[in-house]
């Protein structure tokens, strides 16, 4: 025969108690969680990385607290699964019943690497890109947003036009945010942005490659305005893009400030 449980040994579940202030919370959860992640690359092979995670849900006015430990349990469930945008959206959908919530968001920010061949020598090296995946779940509906920062070279058209010996150029960051309603791979977006810079970047270049990069940028000058417009035009023409935001920052080599532009569509 089982002995009765001593009430003194039963731990109270304070967070499940009712709240009397009647104020709903739009987002509550965990933030700044560093956790391993497998990202399915363009070739389908999983790329291990470490992401900075934010997971939140909406909390009704009558509930005192959410179940914080369940967010980490969800991360553990998906830790060894190669992530695609579709699976990331499914993860956000799974979070809602787990947390007894009607709405919730998941954000994962991580470095992503592409192996690139230098333009002349063909020597291979990795280049890193800063990426965010964002899933916003409401009931059975999930909106997926991809944010990727692509470094490129920009060369000033005005400087080229007025100078006899060259033109000032610099590294630029083009940050693209897209809400997808169809298929558009992350690698294709990165390639699209790199095509619209004065020249793309590589991790490792030999002297013949440096010559190519210098001359390629000189033959393809672009203002920061050109950068955002050209990338926006490419995105607007793609049927898989529902909304987009293109942001470019040129770290000017002849000024102590940046040139900056944004296009939204």
Curated annotation (Swiss-Prot):
Q: What is its EC number?
A: 3.5.4.16
Molecular function per GO: GTP cyclohydrolase I activity
Q: Identify the metabolic or biological route this protein is part of.
A: Cofactor biosynthesis; 7,8-dihydroneopterin triphosphate biosynthesis; 7,8-dihydroneopterin triphosphate from GTP: step 1/1
Site May be catalytically important: which residues? 156
| Source taxon at top rank | Bacteria
**Keyword entries, A-Z:** Hydrolase
Ranges annotated as spanning the membrane: none
Reaction(s) the record says it catalyses: GTP + H2O = 7,8-dihydroneopterin 3'-triphosphate + formate + H(+)
> Broadest EC class?
hydrolase
Matching entries from InterPro entries are given as:
GTP_cyclohydrolase_FolE2, GTP_cyclohydrolase_FolE2/MptA
List this protein's GO terms for biological process: tetrahydrofolate biosynthetic process
User: Which Gene3D superfamilies does this entry report, sorted A to Z?
Assistant: Urate Oxidase
PANTHER family, per this entry? GTP CYCLOHYDROLASE MPTA (PTHR36445:SF1)
Quote the function comment for this protein: Converts GTP to 7,8-dihydroneopterin triphosphate.
The record's family statement is: Belongs to the GTP cyclohydrolase IV family.
- Protein name as it appears in the record: GTP cyclohydrolase FolE2
């Amino acid at each position: 025969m089982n002995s009765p449980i001593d009430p003194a040994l039963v731990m109270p579940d304070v967070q499940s108690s009712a709240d009397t202030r009647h104020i709903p919370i739009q987002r509550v959860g965990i933030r700044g969680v560093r956790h391993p992640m497998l990202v399915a690359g363009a070739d389908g092979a999983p790329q291990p990385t470490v992401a900075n995670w934010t997971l939140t849900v909406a909390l009704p006015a009558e509930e005192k607290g959410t179940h914080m430990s369940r967010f980490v349990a969800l991360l553990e469930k998906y830790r060894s699964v190669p992530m695609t945008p579709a699976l990331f959206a499914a993860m956000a959908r799974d979070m809602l019943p787990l947390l007894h919530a009607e709405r919730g968001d998941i954000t994962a920010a991580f470095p992503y690497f592409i192996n690139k061949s230098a333009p002349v020598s063909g020597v291979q090296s990795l280049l890193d890109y800063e990426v965010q995946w964002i899933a916003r779940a409401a009931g059975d509906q999930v909106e997926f947003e991809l944010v990727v920062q692509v470094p490129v070279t920009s060369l000033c058209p005005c400087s080229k036009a007025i100078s006899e010996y060259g033109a000032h150029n610099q590294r630029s960051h083009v940050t693209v945010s897209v809400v997808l309603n169809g298929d558009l791979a992350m690698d294709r977006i990165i390639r699209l942005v790199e095509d619209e810079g004065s020249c793309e970047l590589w991790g490792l270049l030999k002297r013949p490659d440096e010559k190519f990069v210098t001359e390629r940028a000189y033959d393809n000058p672009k203002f920061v305005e050109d950068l955002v417009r050209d990338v926006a035009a490419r995105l607007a023409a793609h049927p898989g893009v529902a909304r987009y935001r293109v942001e470019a920052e040129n770290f000017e080599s002849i000024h102590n400030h940046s040139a900056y532009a944004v296009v939204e569509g």
